[in-house]
Amino acid sequence: MIEFRDVWFWYQEGKTVLKSISFSFSEGTLAIVGPNGSGKTTLVKMLNGLLKPKKGNVLIDGINTKEVSVAELSRIVGYVFQNPDAMFFEENVFKEVAFGPKNLGLNEEEVKKRVRWALEAVGLRGFENRNPFELSGGEKQRLAIACILAMKPKYLVLDEPNTGLDERGLQDLINVIKNLRREGSSIILVTHDIELVLEVADKVLLLKDGELKFFGSTKEFFELDLEGFGLKEPELVKISKDVGINFVRNVEELLKVIGL
């Protein structure tokens, strides 16, 4: 379980970025949303110890992040950064994904097994000999996820994973997230894309000006006045409300509900 207990953070005195944040999350897909500058990335950097609370505590499965190293936390919390290119340095996809498990001290057979599993999970089987830097934007994003998956962390943080993706890349990402969820991964997703939230999130955490404004189910989130928080309500949600339908995640669900 991830627990934030009255967490405060500031980069310099007089400019508080997070204010008394408290919540707990154990499984599923949690989307963290909010306007620019609301503290989203600051919050998730506390999950693997890149940042430590100035006041309060962050606990990961009972471990206080103030008391352990980033390396120790990385075995529990995997972090995929916004720019996947910054993660790559090997000459091919196989070596890239194998790097993490090798550093965990696993034997060669287990490393190969994890690489195969991770590439299968993100739809990149057959890419083993490809140069990471020659992949498309969506393929690079999926490779970055595979690199972290191969280390088998309990929690996976995706920070703005759909940045720069075209429609096909976004759909591939959605499929990866759904696949990982089916396999039991717990995912923390930071995004500005409210339609992505609608499609994949089980719970939503809303930040504004460093304050926790909402934490609850995706259904409850879309009952809020999103525009009042500087967020755009998806057209699908508007249409659903107009025709008196409670909650659907995509067009296919909407058509099924109305009998088309």
Curated annotation (Swiss-Prot):
<feature type="binding site">
    <location>
        <begin position="34"/>
        <end position="41"/>
    </location>
    <ligand>
        <name>ATP</name>
    </ligand>
</feature>
<dbReference type="InterPro" id="IPR003439">
    <property type="entry name" value="ABC_transporter-like_ATP-bd"/>
</dbReference>
<dbReference type="InterPro" id="IPR017871">
    <property type="entry name" value="ABC_transporter-like_CS"/>
</dbReference>
<dbReference type="GO" id="GO:0043190">
    <property type="term" value="C:ATP-binding cassette (ABC) transporter complex"/>
</dbReference>
<dbReference type="GO" id="GO:0016887">
    <property type="term" value="F:ATP hydrolysis activity"/>
</dbReference>
<dbReference type="InterPro" id="IPR015856">
    <property type="entry name" value="ABC_transpr_CbiO/EcfA_su"/>
</dbReference>
<dbReference type="Pfam" id="PF00005">
    <property type="entry name" value="ABC_tran"/>
</dbReference>
<keyword id="KW-0547">Nucleotide-binding</keyword>
<dbReference type="GO" id="GO:0042626">
    <property type="term" value="F:ATPase-coupled transmembrane transporter activity"/>
</dbReference>
<dbReference type="InterPro" id="IPR005876">
    <property type="entry name" value="Co_trans_ATP-bd"/>
</dbReference>
<comment type="similarity">
    <text>Belongs to the ABC transporter superfamily.</text>
</comment>
<keyword id="KW-0472">Membrane</keyword>
<feature type="domain" description="ABC transporter">
    <location>
        <begin position="2"/>
        <end position="234"/>
    </location>
</feature>
<comment type="function">
    <text>Probably part of an ABC transporter complex. Responsible for energy coupling to the transport system.</text>
</comment>
<protein>
    <recommendedName>
        <fullName>Putative ABC transporter ATP-binding protein PH0132</fullName>
        <ecNumber>7.-.-.-</ecNumber>
    </recommendedName>
</protein>
<keyword id="KW-0067">ATP-binding</keyword>
<dbReference type="GO" id="GO:0006824">
    <property type="term" value="P:cobalt ion transport"/>
</dbReference>
<dbReference type="GO" id="GO:0005524">
    <property type="term" value="F:ATP binding"/>
</dbReference>
<dbReference type="InterPro" id="IPR027417">
    <property type="entry name" value="P-loop_NTPase"/>
</dbReference>
<keyword id="KW-1278">Translocase</keyword>
<dbReference type="InterPro" id="IPR003593">
    <property type="entry name" value="AAA+_ATPase"/>
</dbReference>
<keyword id="KW-1003">Cell membrane</keyword>
<keyword id="KW-0813">Transport</keyword>
<dbReference type="InterPro" id="IPR050095">
    <property type="entry name" value="ECF_ABC_transporter_ATP-bd"/>
</dbReference>
